[in-house]
Amino acid sequence: MTEQEKMLAGKIYDPSDKTLTELRTKGHRLSKLYNDTFDTEEEKRKEILDELLPNHGEGCFLQGPIYFDYGPFTTMGNGCYANFNFTVLDTCPVTIGDSVFFGPNCTIATPMHPFRWQERNIKFKDDGTGYDDEYGKPITIGSNCWIASNV
């Protein structure tokens, strides 16, 4: 089982895995590109969003700034709206239904860390690089929800 397969299945995985690091870097880069656009640059925003969130519905509007860990592991239905500072840490699948509204400063966070410090603390590989054990829990938000601000 690859580290990505473990991650998406909610099993303990190594987030420093090369493939995951590349995917996360791409998600961060696309988030920044989106954040560097204006509301009026609709076509450019759509192109970036199509690459960042290939599983999004029609008529989605993300105000920006936005922050995605990966992007492709998030599914967003039709007619969704997210206000300023929308953050999605999608180490496990995130499913958002149709017509869901997010107020400012909302975060959807799937990552989990072991509760016991002995298991949670940073570990070191033979080459000296540090990593932590992480796992995730999927999040599903049904249709027609309004998630207010600072949630």
Where are these regions (language model features)?
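Terminal amphipathic alpha-helical/low-complexity segments used for targeting or macromolecular assembly
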Residues: 1-59, 115-118
